[in-house]
């Protein structure tokens, strides 16, 4: 049975459509093939292994909760583990959605075609619809593999721990594992569709220069939001559920993580009326996210190809960018020399590259969150620390060069001339 399937897969990959799908898959997960790339990239094996780690570690974090000996020692007898495990179900849902959302935001530029794709594929006798369908197929395959990889370990171990504590049979374990797999997979796919739909809609509606200007900040907002979702997973959904029971019209009902928690409990027949109501929002919410993703993908694909032909203005020609540079130049040294030149060059390099802008925007977002939660005296210190941390991360990211730079600076290592510029 396997050899015919293997032969069919090999023949499919050798077709022009199969080669296109393989090309787009490699571009989604390639590691270090593009010298001008500013992303921190990993190979396929390292990426899949890294993405599987959070779920695996989380399983062993919650293992003591389902120890039969500890339950007996604490005097907890005859517990309904389908209800006891509710916070952990929410934790795994939040973890799956967080990892999926962060990777989708970071890989956003690799999902749509870039100038290299157009220059390589446009001269070939291939219809644009075939290229679009091949890219869509590659995205679907990548999302499916990604969803399975992120949730593979928790799908086995978490139901095993819960059913072992409840001392039930194999049938209940299989049912629990199937329910867990369905809910976390649906949450993973929904997160990808939602992030893609929102970013794609902004890309399709906003002018190209406006989207390029605000893309880094929008992605940073998504990253901060997903980090907050992860924190809520460790704190538990109890506060959300209490607020929802007290105020059914609360904005909390629009949290997708609670939708899938309600679906989880409904499939196991342990849902409260509030959770049962939230479970009904999974279908319309998922359908809306998928529809927006398909529409924005088609429009964004066409606009990205048009952008390659038309080109774009340099960042230095944009008015807002020029005003920001003039303001930041006020912090440089007044006297001409290496320190002033190094400061001006570093500022422009940090604001020019997408990865550096995202790093700074995430630091500013976390700083705002820390300032909102801390008192008036501690807020400036927390914000300044996170901003310095974001700058330090930005210094470690490589800056992509659009052309070969012929200028070099020869420095005396004993003078440490770059330190004053970095401090400014």
Would you name each region that the model predicts?
Residues 111-112, 121-134, 139-140, 204:
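A conserved hydrophobic secondary-structure block that centers on an alpha-helix together
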Residues 134, 353, 360-363, 400, ...:
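Generic beta-strand/beta-sheet core signal
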Residues 103-124, 391-410:
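Transmembrane helix boundary and interhelical loop/hinge segments in multi-pass membrane proteins
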Residues 1-101, 146-391:
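Transmembrane alpha-helical segments and their membrane-interface loop/helix boundaries
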Residues 358-360, 374-377, 395-400, 404-406, ...:
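Extended hydrophobic-aromatic, low-complexity segments
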């Amino acid at each position: 049975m396997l050899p015919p399937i293997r032969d069919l897969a090999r023949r499919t990959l050798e077709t022009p459509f199969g080669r296109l799908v393989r090309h787009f898959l490699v571009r989604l997960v390639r590691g270090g093939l593009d010298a001008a790339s500013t992303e921190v990239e990993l190979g396929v094996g390292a990426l899949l292994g890294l993405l599987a780690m959070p779920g695996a570690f989380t399983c062993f974090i919650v293992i003591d909760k389902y120890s039969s000996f500890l339950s007996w020692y604490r005097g907890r007898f005859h517990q309904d583990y389908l209800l006891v495990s509710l916070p952990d179900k929410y934790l795994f849902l939040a973890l799956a959605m967080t990892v999926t959302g962060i990777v989708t935001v970071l890989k956003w530029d690799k999902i749509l075609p870039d100038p290299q794709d157009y220059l390589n594929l446009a001269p070939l006798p291939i219809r644009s619809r075939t290229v679009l369908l091949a890219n869509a197929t590659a995205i679907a395959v990548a999302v499916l593999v990604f969803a399975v990889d992120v949730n593979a370990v928790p799908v086995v171990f978490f139901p095993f721990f819960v059913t072992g504590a409840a001392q039930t049979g194999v049938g209940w374990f299989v049912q629990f594992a199937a329910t867990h797999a369905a809910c976390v997979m649906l949450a993973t796919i929904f997160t990808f569709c939602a992030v893609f739909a929102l970013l794609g809609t902004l890309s399709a509606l906003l002018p190209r220069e406006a989207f390029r200007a605000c893309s880094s900040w929008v992605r940073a907002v998504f990253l901060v939001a997903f980090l907050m979702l992860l924190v809520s997973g460790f704190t538990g959904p109890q506060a959300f559920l209490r607020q929802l029971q007290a105020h059914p019209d609360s904005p909390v009902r629009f949290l997708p993580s609670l939708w899938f928690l309600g679906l989880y409990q409904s499939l196991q027949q342990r849902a409260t009326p509030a959770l049962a109501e939230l479970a009904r929002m999974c279908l319309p919410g998922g359908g809306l996210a998928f529809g927006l993703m398909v529409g924005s993908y088609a429009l964004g694909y066409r606009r990205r190809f048009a952008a390659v032909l038309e080109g774009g203005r340099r960042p230095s020609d944009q008015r807002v960018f020029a005003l920001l540079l003039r303001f930041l130049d006020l912090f440089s040294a007044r006297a001409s020399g290496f320190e002033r030149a190094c400061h001006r060059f570093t500022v422009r390099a940090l604001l020019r590259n997408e990865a550096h802008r995202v790093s700074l925007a995430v630091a500013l977002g976390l700083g705002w969150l820390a300032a909102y939660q801390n008192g008036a005296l501690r807020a400036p210190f927390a914000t300044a620390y996170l901003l310095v941390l974001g700058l330090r991360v930005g210094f470690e990211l490589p800056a992509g060069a659009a052309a070969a730079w012929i200028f070099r600076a020869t420095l005396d290592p004993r003078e440490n001339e770059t330190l004053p510029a970095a401090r400014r």
